[in-house]
Amino acid sequence: MLFAMMLTLAVTAAGQDPKPTPQKLFESGKYQEAIDSVRERPDAPEDQVYLRALAHRKLNQNDEAKQAFGSLAGAPEGSAWRMIGNSGNALVDGNLDAAQEAANHAVEADGGSAQARYQLGLVESARNNQPQAAAAFAKAAELDPQMAYAHYEAGMAYYKAKRVDKMAVYFENFLKLASAAPERPAVLSIMKTVRGK
């Protein structure tokens, strides 16, 4: 009897989905839930604070985004996170020159940071420098292959730069990584149009 109860509990526990990560919440368009999940942790790592800032931007909550970017900007002098925060705040303010300078410094400080490359891509995209944006997002995706939105943004930038060969690769990766993303229908439509099917 005891064995049967333990087996039932084990099967029930195994069948339950673990609490989704802030990244998975973000990738499924649950931006407020992603924000709340990060806020629950006062010691949240910088990559999650950055994700929180991006989620605020998706919800057009620019003041809250600036708070999150501001906490990153409080990182030690010379760190990539400090520059990412500064770039994010400048981008929210529409100061593209300052955003570009800070993003470039973030990449110089830590060229292996997917988030630094992603931030650079956001700035290049805002400046309508699509080939440079595509290269930055593609590098972010290379550095962190699980970063779904790096694939999405690379695909969009390649699409705008009329490089549909590269666009398709990044969009396919995005669709695999973020199957519940709100951008999924638009990506599928673009892929269908480009492929003529």
What are these regions (language model features)?
Residues 32-33, 59-68, 92-105, 127-139, ...:
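Structural signature of tandem alpha-helical TPR/SEL1-like repeats
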Residues 40-47, 77-78, 112, 146, ...:
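Short coil loop/turn residues that delineate tetratricopeptide repeat
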Residues 40-43, 70-74, 104-108, 138-142, ...:
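Conserved structural position within tetratricopeptide repeats
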Residues 7-51, 58-60:
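N-terminal leader/linker segments that initiate helical-solenoid repeat arrays
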Residues 51, 85-86, 119, 153, ...:
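Canonical tetratricopeptide repeat
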Residues 47-50, 81, 115, 149, ...:
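Start-of-helix register in tetratricopeptide repeats
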Residues 23, 54, 88-89, 122, ...:
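Residue-level recognition of tetratricopeptide repeat
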